[in-house]
Amino acid sequence: LDLHGMFKPSGLNVCYPNVLSFEGVRGLENCKWHNYDMPAYDVTMPFIRMAAGPVDYTPGAMNNASRYVFRPVTQQPMSMGTRVHQLASYVVFDSPLQMLCDSPTFYERNVDCTRFIASVPTVFDEYVPLQSKVGKYLSVAKRKGDEWFVGALTNWDKRTITIDFSFLPAGTYKATVFTDGINADRNATDYRKTEITVTSDMVLKYDMASGGGVAMRIQKL
């Protein structure tokens, strides 16, 4: 069960493990009718609401808008912030039953993004909090088996975030990295995909656009 239109979890899923997720959150659907500050909410909610249990935020918007372009439109809704902000949400937000909020044809057109979303597990074996500040930005690394995923989000302030890869065990890894594109402040759908080799002794810096993020999948070589 995924309980939508529901208050935050309070132990029901402990007694009934078939209850996989709860709404109880100002989810992405609110962008259809209001201009709440969603990027700021996205870097606040995980520290508060998500502490109570899984959250069905329904991420995955492919129609993305910068701060000064966004408008609440019911017929053709858009998300606040960048495309990579949406991708990173799948790593950051915990929900054993995840959703794709947008039109199926959007995912067919955006194959790289769709493949990344499909690769992110819905449950993990290990969580490692990284550089974060409530209401400002956050980053987290999560492990499933031998694979790691990193998600980072920022509010409307563009910033550079540092990812310390010391959470990785010894060895060499391939990281598939999605970062905000050079034009993401104006065209929020703009992103850059790269593949790099990383080890546990590396520390890398990534620029996040206004309402942006970083998303990566790390596989052992």
Q: What does each model-identified segment do?
A:
Residues 1-76:
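Aromatic- and carboxylate-enriched substrate-binding clefts and catalytic-loop regions
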Residues 177-201:
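Solvent-exposed beta-strand/loop surfaces of large extracellular or lumenal domains
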Residues 167-181:
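Solvent-exposed beta-hairpin/edge-strand motifs
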Residues 133-170, 214-215:
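Carbohydrate-binding surface patches
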Residues 195-221:
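C-terminal beta-strand-rich structural cap/linker in extracellular carbohydrate-active enzymes
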Residues 102-149, 185-189:
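Glycan-recognition and catalytic regions of carbohydrate-active enzymes
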Residues 1, 92, 150, 211:
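Conserved, mostly hydrophobic/aromatic
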Residues 1-5, 28-34, 96-107, 124-128, ...:
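Acidic/polar loop patches that form or flank catalytic/metal-binding clefts of enzymes
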